[in-house]
């Protein structure tokens, strides 16, 4: 058979493109060329004649026109349907060509400033932008950022009022994605100053203004997503796509930014105050989760100024944000009790209920996250805030003079000619392969006189005068003086350190973590959210947040006064024990009614009660008389000793009786096999696993001890009684056998005959070779299944469980207990199944 060339392999379209390109240059029609089916394939396969034509400036300009021009006319097709407009097809093909992985096209565009200016004039269009056009524009420029990073970044930084132009289209998601792509190019190992430049252009403050409660909610939600994305890519981690802490994320937690944000969130008279509150809380939550100081590789408390000078890549400090939000707790409490938007009763299948509302839920969620933040070690340290203030003061001075260590590049330490150079200097290209001055966790190099070179040139980032070598050396000496308390050395330099009075005043303030807990106690935060737990019995999102707060309070280190005070407040003011009992009684009344059902909070109520009981068991010796009266109350004791115990037992009960593994064995066995428990090692192991899962560690050891003794004695005396495991198996098997009716036996026989007939029919159409292969596969499958079927006991794998035995128990135990335990471990490690009593 012969293929007709030109149809199956695309030669026809290729020849058509060649025919168009063979025409005189002034007769080539770009539109006609783009309408050919194979033009994209030819472009991506690097057709030299096609690329030569496409790389011409006038052709590239026309391709850009196809992307930018708007043609909203829709021409109906002949059959009355809708046909894709011609201009839409041309825009798509033009964007695919400009974003194709062809180096010559990318280079021809980026190096032609006229073309780039024309392309970026798209931002000058009046909004709202066409979403399809915006996606094409973003796609092309993201490709340019990937392939020609330095040139594209340099061009973007040359655009006048870039931040204003791009935020003019904040409601267009494709444009915001392009902004995030631009920021993400400023990685730690190849930092090119994008974050610092956007900081100097006022990006964060411009975004923040769009979160005003007087701005349209759709714009607010889009801007909030952009800010959260900036926080995510600025996290202090080594994950792919993360650029690390930077000037933008640091500005987000500054006093000015947080003050403005809290004012927006609490402006109840504004038309869209609820939207501002919801978005503000989501931003704060993202800040806390992405900047947990407990996970910093180098904690700030271990970064003295003389050995770790501040950089823009230092970990983000959340103390200022936490203090400002703690001061606003009274305002948030008013909104929680009386939100700006009240919803009517909502009909459900079980009656009308009062909806919680987004404002209430977000405030409760904010409380939980602020509590998480207050428990960070840095925010619980008395010296943490003062130390961070000194670092921030020095960092601001260095940044203003464009000499912060973030912008320095250092070569290998062993290189005698190693120098520091500014990222924006003319000599940057000569040092672009050198290592960065610090990594993403804020570590900075030792700055010495030999390797210091701070000669800078003009840059778009800052107009400040660069500091000289002597000034920088003075600053470093001042940093050392601050660290060692040398006031004389600090006064001899142009750099003015923080006054000692400011530092002392900061130390006199309550520790930030404790300050939040004090505000919680004074404003009855815990009692309020506990009331909401029972007022909204069907909102499981709220129940989960309340449980999070309770377990944080009760599991915090109680050696700190405010942690213990907050826990006591939960009992005294929050009356958590009384409310748990009340919730249980209310649920019992509902269940007792005809067609009654459990309250929606009962699952969380049980685990909250478990946390309370655990706390009481650990710290009851420190309780005062009022607390003792609460926990010794008759209703509470009855709940703990009866209701809660019954609930635990019910929750731990196997719903289906036997475990699925044992049920499977029972179904596959006939009556004769079922009566002989000792011939069923698989079933024996399944029962052993069940006993282990439902018994204590001591019970498991006792079972193994009896198994080992019975196994050794079976050879000597066949008349011995069965061991406990065999007795349990025989009991279960006899119970199953006794309940099997004649109908069940007939069903088993029918299934057996049906299976035999099916097997015989299948064997008629299979060869002996196939049978052998099938047997091999079955053997392999069984061996694999057995490997997974007999896992080693978790009790013996986890060595920590062995330490649960007290010293007295070890002394009172028999000498053979260790041998028995070793025997059981050896049996498990060898993958054996314990068989006895054949």
UniProtKB/Swiss-Prot annotation:
One of the GO BP terms on file: negative regulation of kinetochore assembly
Biased composition (Acidic residues): 690-700, 714-723, 768-779, 806-818
UniProt-listed InterPro entries: SAPS
Subcellular location: Nucleus
Modified residues (Phosphoserine): 411, 418, 425, 459, 468, 491, 494, 711, 713
Region (Disordered): 411-468, 690-745, 757-838
Keywords: Cell cycle, Cell division, Mitosis, Nucleus, Phosphoprotein
Role description: Has a role in chromosome segregation. May provide a dynamic connection between kinetochore microtubules and kinetochore chromatin.
The protein, known as: Extragenic suppressor of kinetochore protein 1
Natural source organism: Schizosaccharomyces pombe (strain 972 / ATCC 24843)
Gene, per the UniProt record: ekc1
């Amino acid at each position: 058979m012969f293929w007709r060339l030109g149809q199956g392999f695309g030669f026809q379209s290729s020849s058509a493109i060649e025919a168009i390109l063979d025409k005189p240059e002034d007769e080539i029609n770009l539109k006609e060329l783009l309408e050919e089916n194979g033009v994209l394939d030819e472009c991506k396969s690097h057709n030299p004649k096609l690329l030569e034509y496409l790389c011409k400036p006038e052709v590239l300009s026309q391709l850009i026109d196809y992307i930018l021009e708007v043609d909203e006319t829709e021409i109906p097709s002949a059959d009355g349907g809708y046909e894709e407009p011609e201009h839409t097809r041309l825009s798509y093909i033009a964007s695919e060509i400009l974003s194709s992985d062809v180096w010559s096209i990318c280079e021809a565009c980026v190096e032609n400033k006229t073309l780039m200016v024309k392309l970026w004039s798209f931002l000058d269009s009046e909004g709202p932008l066409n979403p399809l056009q915006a996606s094409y524009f973003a796609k092309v420029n993201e490709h340019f950022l990937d392939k020609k990073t330095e040139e594209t970044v340099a061009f973007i930084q040359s655009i006048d009022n870039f931040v204003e132009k791009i935020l003019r289209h904040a409601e267009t998601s494709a444009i915001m994605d392009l902004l995030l792509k631009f920021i993400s190019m400023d990685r730690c190992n190849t930092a090119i100053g994008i974050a610092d430049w956007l900081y100097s252009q006022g990006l964060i403050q411009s975004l923040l203004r769009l979160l005003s409660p007087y701005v349209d909610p759709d714009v607010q939600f889009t801007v909030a997503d952009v800010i959260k994305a900036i926080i995510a890519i600025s996290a202090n981690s080594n994950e792919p796509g993360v650029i690390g802490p930077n000037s933008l994320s640091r500005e987000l937690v500054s006093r000015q930014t947080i003050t403005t944000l809290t004012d927006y969130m609490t402006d109840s008279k504004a038309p869209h105050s609820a939207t501002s509150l919801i978005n503000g809380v989501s931003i704060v939550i993202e800040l806390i989760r992405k900047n947990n100081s407990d996970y910093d590789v180098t904690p700030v408390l271990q970064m003295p100024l003389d050995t770790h000078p501040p950089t823009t890549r230092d970990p983000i400090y959340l103390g200022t944000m936490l203090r400002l939000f703690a001061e606003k707790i009274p305002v948030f409490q008013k909104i929680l009790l009386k939100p700006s938007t009240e919803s009517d009763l909502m009909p459900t299948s079980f009656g009308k209920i009062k909806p919680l509302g987004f404002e209430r839920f977000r405030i409760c969620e904010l409380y939980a996250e602020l509590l998480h933040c207050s428990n960070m070690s840095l925010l619980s340290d008395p010296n943490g805030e003062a130390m961070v203030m000194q670092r921030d003061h020095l960092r601001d001075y260095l940044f203003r003079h464009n000499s912060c260590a973030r912008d320095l590049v250092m070569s290998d330490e062993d290189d005698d000619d190693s120098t520091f150079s500014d990222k924006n200097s003319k000599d940057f290209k000569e040092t672009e392969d050198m290592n960065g001055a610090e990594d993403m966790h804020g570590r900075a190099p030792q700055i010495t006189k030999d390797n210091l070179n701070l000669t800078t040139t003009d840059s778009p980032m800052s107009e400040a005068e660069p500091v000289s070598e002597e000034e920088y050396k003075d600053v470093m000496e001042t940093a050392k003086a601050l660290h060692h308390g040398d006031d004389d050395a600090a006064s001899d330099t142009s750099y003015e350190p923080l006054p000692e009075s400011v530092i002392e005043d900061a130390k006199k303030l309550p520790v930030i973590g404790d300050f939040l807990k004090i505000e919680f106690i004074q404003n009855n935060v815990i009692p309020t959210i506990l009331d909401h737990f029972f007022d909204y019995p069907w909102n499981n999102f709220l129940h989960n947040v309340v449980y999070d707060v309770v377990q944080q309070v009760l599991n915090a280190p109680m050696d700190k006064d405010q942690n213990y005070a907050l826990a006591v407040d939960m009992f005294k003011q929050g009356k958590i024990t009384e409310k748990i009992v009340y919730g249980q009684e209310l649920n019992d009344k509902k269940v007792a009614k005809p067609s009654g059902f459990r309250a929606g909070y009962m699952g969380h109520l049980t685990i909250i009660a478990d946390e309370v009981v655990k706390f009481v068991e650990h710290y009851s010796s420190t309780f005062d008389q009022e607390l003792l009266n609460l926990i010794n109350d008759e209703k509470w004791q009855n709940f703990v000793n009866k209701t809660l115990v019954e609930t635990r037992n019910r929750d731990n009960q196997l719903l289906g009786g036997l475990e699925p593994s044992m049920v499977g064995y029972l179904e596959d066995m006939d009556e004769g096999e079922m009566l002989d428990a000792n011939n069923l090692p698989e079933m024996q192991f399944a029962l052993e696993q069940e006993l282990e899962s439902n018994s204590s560690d001591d019970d498991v050891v006792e079972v193994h001890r009896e198994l080992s003794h019975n196994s050794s004695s079976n050879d000597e005396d066949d008349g011995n009684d069965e061991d406990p495991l065999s007795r349990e198996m025989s009991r279960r098997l006899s119970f199953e056998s006794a309940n099997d009716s004649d109908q069940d036996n007939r069903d088993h026989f029918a299934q057996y005959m049906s299976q035999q007939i099916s097997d015989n029919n299948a064997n008629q159409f299979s060869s002996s070779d196939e049978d052998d292969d099938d047997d091999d596969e079955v053997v392999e499958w069984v061996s694999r299944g057995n490997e997974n079927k007999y896992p080693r006991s978790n009790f013996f794998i986890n060595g920590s469980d062995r330490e649960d035995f007290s010293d007295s128990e070890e002394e009172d135990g028999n000498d053979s207990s260790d041998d028995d335990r070793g025997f059981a471990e050896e049996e498990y490690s060898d993958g054996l199944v314990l068989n006895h009593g054949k």
